[in-house]
Amino acid sequence: MAIQHPDIQPAVNHSVQVAIAGAGPVGLMMANYLGQMGIDVLVVEKLDKLIDYPRAIGIDDEALRTMQSVGLVENVLPHTTPWHAMRFLTPKGRCFADIQPMTDEFGWPRRNAFIQPQVDAVMLEGLSRFPNVRCLFARELEAFSQQNDEVTLHLKTAEGQRETVKAQWLVACDGGASFVRRTLNVPFEGKTAPNQWIVVDIANDPLSTPHIYLCCDPVRPYVSAALPHAVRRFEFMVMPGETEEQLREPQNMRKLLSKVLPNPDNVELIRQRVYTHNARLAQRFRIDRVLLAGDAAHIMPVWQGQGYNSGMRDAFNLAWKLALVIQGKARDALLDTYQQERRDHAKAMIDLSVTAGNVLAPPKRWQGTLRDGVSWLLNYLPPVKRYFLEMRFKPMPQYYGGALMREGEAKHSPVGKMFIQPKVTLENGDVTLLDNAIGANFAVIGWGCNPLWGMSDEQIQQWRALGTRFIQVVPEVQIHTAQDNHDGVLRVGDTQGRLRSWFAQHNASLVVMRPDRFVAATAIPQTLGKTLNKLASVMTLTRPDADVSVEKVA
């Protein structure tokens, strides 16, 4: 199905604040976030429509939280299957690892299956909310150049017409074969897996069993995944000497499917495609006024479903910083923290994905035997087994430097980690997720205390100019105690008791949360002012105009 934006009228020449190359998921998320921040954005896409065939099939809790930040999560959820377990099977069908993480610390299920084209369509439609965002399809980026204060892009339409775009910044979301990255000669180091995989998508799921199964068969490893809307995906390793053309032949496709279906002739094929798995990482994510994101910056095997989710992390990390710089609220040195924070974690996710692929299809037969033996031994080590089955091995993003203020012992500090998102009770009695109360803003969140108490008038002025929300968390039973109200502070009740537990664990009563929901700093009321001054310096924040209104509550 062709998916195109109905309200977009192309122009010959364009002048915008941000140009985004690529209307894939990362480019669309960047455009939605920047759009809601009032930034003038132009997305240019080489294809004439969104890609309409399934690619990624796993979306995690962090990516859903990112969707929530741009007001689209409720439209995305109908295209997901929550709590999607991953089960590893021996060649005889014995389940030796059942990964079923049941935590929802960030407000959403940790593992979910999804249909990418439908979610991409939700993000594209989301752009129609913003008159300051345009998306042009069938535009090939032929060349670009950087000047001191802008980037000039040269485009060619499908009819051969030329167009010019002048932008303050260019975000390259143009995929693993990124034209932008290659033009800038940014090394893309890593390796390509020797084996290819053929992906077969089938409508009216002929199995209809839930979850995803990875069968570690040394003869031909395969994957069977239940997807939303009754779609079944099979992935089979392409063996040496086989070609895509051969496997597409009806008799060979029937032979493949007979491995997993009792009646391989009675299926509704959607499509078959052969993929090569790459593990590569760009040496640099920022080159002056050009920033690389998503597959243009890193690509990884599919086995942990983290390629898509890593791209969402890029978009969430970069978009708020870019908005602050364009709005004049921070200097462009803030953008250097994008690579500083995201590159190491992208590398960790690449390594995890490669390892998972080696578990499914070990390069050596003896490694498969070792894997099966270790999995059997884990049954006698319940704590170790839970570590794997609850997916605690997944490297959670943690930043040790960048746009944050870390003091004291780094190992146990919450600074640089994503803040939790429990349910909270508002003063009108409504119960909602924490981010819904905050919006796409900074937040200073205090347990029991007035978060403005330790701030000077100048600090209140500076942080309010950023759109910061000041939140006082109280036990839910205290939410209607009127004498505790403070002007300019939103009071919320700790519905589930999770915020109290978080503050008790981390020996702090105040947390500064960034727009991407990461903890930028912690403090107590008497140290908050000093901490905010240091944080403003680290983030290269500028001083607001003197006419910004100030309310100081003692």
Swiss-Prot record:
Pfam families hit by this protein: FAD_binding_3
Pathway, per record: Aromatic compound metabolism; 3-phenylpropanoate degradation
Catalytic activity: 3-(3-hydroxyphenyl)propanoate + NADH + O2 + H(+) = 3-(2,3-dihydroxyphenyl)propanoate + NAD(+) + H2O; (2E)-3-(3-hydroxyphenyl)prop-2-enoate + NADH + O2 + H(+) = (2E)-3-(2,3-dihydroxyphenyl)prop-2-enoate + NAD(+) + H2O
A GO molecular-function annotation: 3-(3-hydroxyphenyl)propionate hydroxylase activity
Keywords for this protein: Aromatic hydrocarbons catabolism, FAD, Flavoprotein, NAD, Oxidoreductase
Residues reported to bind FAD: 17-46, 285-295
SUPFAM superfamilies referenced in this protein's UniProt entry, alphabetically: FAD/NAD(P)-binding domain
Domain of life of the source: Bacteria
EC number: 1.14.13.127
Cofactor(s) the protein needs: FAD
GO BP terms: 3-(3-hydroxy)phenylpropionate catabolic process; 3-phenylpropionate catabolic process
UniProt similarity note: Belongs to the PheA/TfdB FAD monooxygenase family.
Function: Catalyzes the insertion of one atom of molecular oxygen into position 2 of the phenyl ring of 3-(3-hydroxyphenyl)propionate (3-HPP) and hydroxycinnamic acid (3HCI).
Protein name: 3-(3-hydroxy-phenyl)propionate/3-hydroxycinnamic acid hydroxylase
Organism: Escherichia coli O139:H28 (strain E24377A / ETEC)
Source species taxonomy: Bacteria, Pseudomonadati, Pseudomonadota, Gammaproteobacteria, Enterobacterales
Gene name for this UniProt entry: mhpA
